[in-house]
Amino acid sequence: MCTTCGCGEGNLYIEGDEHNPHSAFRSAPFAPAARPKMKITGIKAPEFTPSQTEEGDLHYGHGEAGTHAPGMSQRRMLEVEIDVLDKNNRLAERNRARFAARKQLVLNLVSSPGSGKTTLLTETLMRLKDSVPCAVIEGDQQTVNDAARIRATGTPAIQVNTGKGCHLDAQMIADAAPRLPLDDNGILFIENVGNLVCPASFDLGEKHKVAVLSVTEGEDKPLKYPHMFAAASLMLLNKVDLLPYLNFDVEKCIACAREVNPEIEIILISATSGEGMDQWLNWLETQRCA
């Protein structure tokens, strides 16, 4: 996971940086990361043997760090992870205090790529725009495509490109949020990078993580990526308008999610048909008033 692999060291870009004369992105915000030639040297890796099932399957998450990186001991990975997450969590608490002072509801939308969360978000914003002030932070590795889609609804949005990074972190939110015009008592939606692994570990200062799972992904996704669904308060089972065309067991999916997180709330939803949208909007209003 990225708390130990260092993927957060990629080229970060937040919309507006290109106008800063001191920004490396002033002339080319989407320049690919440099690929310098690297000298490969031999590394004597600490001994680590993955667990093995009777069928021969290998499991690299059984060590004390819960993961594996070549050339790094389990104890060192734990030290790196604790250091990274401690810094992030302190920043997240500052973000949370700022949002709470303005009574803003902040939600961290997480999912696999292609789950439909941007389409669901645009439909949500269209339904809220005359009643609730909203703003959006869009996270992707590259492009401002999704932020442009959000702005087309009339909602303020800012794109955060993580470069090689596979998730948003609390510092990115601290940098991006002040650039958005969001009134007190409004809702800030943070659409995280499409990834069901690393975003689970990084607190952004949100009130809730909302996991979006598409019915095209398979019923057992919560069991395959348990950390994300354990961290989420709500699961939106998306694209249910496609159920007549799929061999997807809704009850099995719900059971898998609740096996990982017995307290998780679940809404069946479709931005295309409108099913579940009222329930989703009611949930948002309940959280705003909580």
From Swiss-Prot:
Effect of residue 242 to A: Cannot form dimers. Can still bind metal in both sites and activate GTP hydrolysis, but hydrogenase activity of the cell is decreased
Phenotypic consequence of residue 246 to A: Cannot form dimers. Can still bind metal in both sites and activate GTP hydrolysis, but hydrogenase activity of the cell is decreased
Effect of residue 167 to A: Does not affect nickel content. Mutant lacks hydrogenase activity
Gene Ontology cellular-component terms listed: GTPase complex
InterPro entries xrefs: CobW/HypB/UreG_nucleotide-bd, Hyd_mat_HypB, P-loop_NTPase
Outcome recorded upon mutating residue 198 to A: Does not affect nickel content
Keyword field contains Cell cycle: no
Protein family according to the UniProt entry: Belongs to the SIMIBI class G3E GTPase family. HypB/HupM subfamily.
Protein name: Hydrogenase maturation factor HypB
Lineage, broadest ranks: Bacteria, Pseudomonadati, Pseudomonadota, Gammaproteobacteria, Enterobacterales
